[in-house]
C-alpha cells in the first residue's frame, strides 16, 4: 500500500535523524490529525522535543494530495510541532497551512492540494 510505504520511509528517516518515531496507526487505526509521533530526549534524558507528522504518499504522477480537516486543524493548533511529510523521497513541510485559515471553513471535511506546490515548498528532513 502506498501510504504504508510512505509511513515506513518517514519512520526510517526519523530514526536516522536521531528521533524516536511511533506509528500512531499501530496504536489507533486512522489516528486523527497525524500518522507519526516522534520524540527526542533532552540532554538529561528527559522528554525533549515532540513533533507530529502527517505522512502523504502518492501513486506516481498523481497531481493532488488530500488533507483532512482534522489534519489541517492539528497543523494550525500545533504549528511548531506539526510536520507534513511528503514521500516520493521524503521531504518535510513545516507550517504547511500558515496564512490559509480563511480557506478552511467549518463545513470543510478535506482539501485537495497540488502535490507539486507542496513539494516545491518542502525541504530535506532535519
Feature locations, PLM:
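Short, solvent-exposed loop/turn segments that connect beta-strands within catalytic domains
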Residues: 42-49, 92
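Domain-level recognition of nuclease-like catalytic cores that cleave nucleotide substrates
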Residues: 78-126
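ASCE P-loop NTPase motor core, strongest for the SF2 helicase catalytic module
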Residues: 1, 7-19, 48
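Nuclease catalytic cores
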Residues: 2-11, 29, 57, 79, ...
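Short, contiguous acidic/charged loop-to-helix segments that flank catalytic cores in large enzymes
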Residues: 1, 24-29, 41-44, 72-75
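Short beta-strand-loop-alpha-helix junction that forms the active-site gateway
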Residues: 55-72
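A short acidic/basic microdomain associated with nuclease active sites
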Residues: 11, 15-41
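Conserved catalytic cores of phosphodiester-cleaving nucleases, focusing on short active-site segments
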Residues: 14, 35-38, 49-59
Amino acid at each position: 500500500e502506498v501510504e504504508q510505504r510512505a509511513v515506513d520511509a518517514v519512520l526510517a528517516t526519523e530514526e536516522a535523524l536521531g528521533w524516536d518515531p511511533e506509528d500512531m496507526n499501530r496504536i489507533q487505526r486512522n489516528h486523527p490529525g497525524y500518522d507519526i509521533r516522534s520524540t527526542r530526549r533532552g540532554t538529561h534524558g528527559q522528554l525533549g522535543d515532540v513533533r507530529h507528522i502527517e505522512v502523504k504518499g502518492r501513486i506516481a504522477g498523481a497531481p493532488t494530495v488530500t488533507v483532512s480537516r482534522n489534519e489541517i486543524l492539528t497543523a494550525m493548533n500545533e504549528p511548531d510541532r506539526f510536520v507534513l511529510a511528503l514521500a516520493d523521497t521524503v521531504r518535510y513541510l513545516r507550517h504547511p497551512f500558515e496564512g490559509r485559515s480563511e480557506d478552511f471553513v467549518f463545513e470543510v471535511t478535506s482539501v485537495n492540494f497540488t502535490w507539486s506546490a507542496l513539494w516545491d515548498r518542502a525541504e530535506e528532513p532535519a
